[in-house]
Amino acid sequence: MSNCVVLCSGGINSTVAAVHAARERDVHLLHIDFGQVAATAQRSAVHDIAQAIGCDTIDIDLPHLTAIAKLHRHANGPSGEHLDSTNQSTPKLTVASVPLLMAELLGIGIQTAIRMGAASVIIGSSEAASEAESEAGPGNGAAYLRQDYYYLFSRLVEMSVSAKNPVHLETPLIDFTRDEIVKIGSRFDTPFDLTYACKTDLGTHCGTCIDCAARHRAFNAAKLQDPAMAAAR
């Protein structure tokens, strides 16, 4: 059975991708803390998911990104700040707010796969979902979620990794909308109750942020109950 590394945030997409991969491969769930607000809750969810589907976890922290974010904050004022539980101002990071962050995350995934002897890196990105949810309309989804982004990154990997031990980048959900991904996950008995997709680090879904709203719409469109959101009420 071949090995694979799944970049996992603990959210729906990456969990569905992991469950699907675990049917035929040994899976390593990779969680990366790059300074995102929900990092602690995400990591806890990833560990719970790993235990449920029978795979191991790899945790990596990127403290240098917090330092970079502080430089950005000083240059642009308080708009990029939030107050943590100690009322101290800390950088608020997202994949969208840090240039080239997705490329860095993918690079870490590739490096991890090489060290683990894994043949592939899997990410649950969905261009279809990004396009559907873009406030600017069709054709204006996030560039780092587009299929051609991963195609170009794959070419870079091919040029950088030994041909004797290639590592392939897989995006199995790239063409599926969020509700379609929920339906796929349901067919594979995905432990949705363990997933976490919220902008906060509360450990339970706040129900009001944009990630919670997108999750709610997806389950409604799929005509399925969301066990994680139900538990948070």
Language model features by range: what are they?
Residues 201-202, 222-233:
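Short cysteine/histidine-rich metal-coordination sites, predominantly Zn2+-binding motifs
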Residues 103, 107, 196-217:
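Local cysteine-cluster metal-coordination motifs and their immediate loop/turn environment
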Residues 190, 216-221:
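A polyampholytic, Gly/Pro-enriched intrinsically disordered region
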Residues 1-189:
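ATP-dependent adenylation/nucleotidyltransferase module used to activate substrates
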Residues 116, 193, 207:
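Structured loop/turn residues at beta-strand edges in well-structured enzyme cores
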Residues 184-187, 192-202:
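Short, intrinsically disordered, charge-biased short linear motifs at domain edges
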